[in-house]
Amino acid sequence: MHLHVLVATVLGTVATTARAIPVTFSNNCATSIGLYDNAYTETIDPGCSTTRDLHDGFSGMFRNGWNPQATLAEFTVSQGFLWYDISIIPTGPQRGPGQCSSLVDCKQLTNGVGFNTPMQIAPASCTPVTCLADGCTDAYQYPTDNGKTHACPDSTPKVDVTFCPGSPKPSCPRRSLRS
């Protein structure tokens, strides 16, 4: 009995690990990006990239900087799908957007912004979403702005998130290896 439980646990772990979706965050901006995920900030130099693996059950966001007034790349891996969207819903220093019904209404209610950096999410073989400026149509602009979430099978081989898409990609500074 214990052997069956151990084998099932190992196989379940392997299956979960096998379904990890690599998300590569690339910085085409002229300045560094502070990739933040509500727990950790990683600096991505201009022209450089970093990869995070999203496992089944992941639900969260990534943005440039710790300030919540930012363009968000939002992901959920659940029920056999990778769900993704860009959000520019304004938040304020003291309050969230509440029940606002437009981008302008949310900005007035929160006295805040939701856009800080151009961004594109491009899953392999699925619909890309792009937000180059405040008010972009591919992004959630207010809480009930339905229809902005997209889905891919969780077998999607990779996702590329690009900060400042369309900008000439700077050269990534060489990293020296210390012996």
Task: Give the predicted meaning of each segment.
Residues M1-P22, R178-S179:
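Fungal secretory targeting signals
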Residues V23-S179:
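Extracellular low-complexity, O-glycosylation-prone Ser/Thr/Pro/Gly-rich "stalks"
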